[in-house]
Amino acid sequence: MLIPKRVKYRRQHRPHRSGVSKGGNRVTFGDYGLQALEPTYITNRQIESARIAINRHMKRGGKVWINIFPDRPLTQKPLGVRMGSGKGPVEKWVANVKPGRILFEASYPNEEVALEALRRAGNKLPCKVRIVKKEDQF
């Protein structure tokens, strides 16, 4: 699972989900990318699930890059606890994703296999995504 090794403050405010991605919206490493179309939080479990889906479909011939990292903690108080008494414990780690952000990149010799692998990864994510090619964006 992807979580930070150490953080200065264990509990943070919730990040804003509005606006568009300022950076990380071009395919740089691979030949194909998975681009978010909606603002959302993506948990470390969802990132891992999508990564496994890509790797299982592409097998050995390809390479995958994960361009997001879950660096923001989300806290939640236990069920049945009254209001007050401080902020709850960290429940999960999330990546704050805004529209336009490239989430995953892949390269594979066969284009159909790479696109199908990214499509399967998109089904594991909580937002609408589209597949972009490196040569189409310039």
UniProtKB/Swiss-Prot annotation:
It comes from the Bacteria. The keyword ATP-binding does not apply. Residues 1-19 have a biased composition (Basic residues). Transmembrane segments: none annotated. One of its GO terms (molecular function) is tRNA binding. SUPFAM superfamilies: Ribosomal protein L16p/L10e (SSF54686). Residues 1-24 are annotated as: Disordered. GO terms for biological process: translation. Pfam families: Ribosomal_L16 (PF00252). GO terms for cellular component: cytosolic large ribosomal subunit. CDD domains: Ribosomal_L16_L10e. Keywords: Ribonucleoprotein, Ribosomal protein, RNA-binding, rRNA-binding, tRNA-binding. InterPro entries: Ribosomal_uL16 (IPR047873), Ribosomal_uL16_bact-type (IPR000114), Ribosomal_uL16_CS (IPR020798), Ribosomal_uL16_dom (IPR016180), Ribosomal_uL16_sf (IPR036920). HAMAP family: Ribosomal_uL16. Part of the 50S ribosomal subunit. Binds 23S rRNA and is also seen to make contacts with the A and possibly P site tRNAs. Belongs to the universal ribosomal protein uL16 family. NCBIfam families: rplP_bact. This is Large ribosomal subunit protein uL16. It comes from Corynebacterium jeikeium (strain K411). The lineage of its organism: Bacteria, Bacillati, Actinomycetota, Actinomycetes, Mycobacteriales. The gene is rplP.
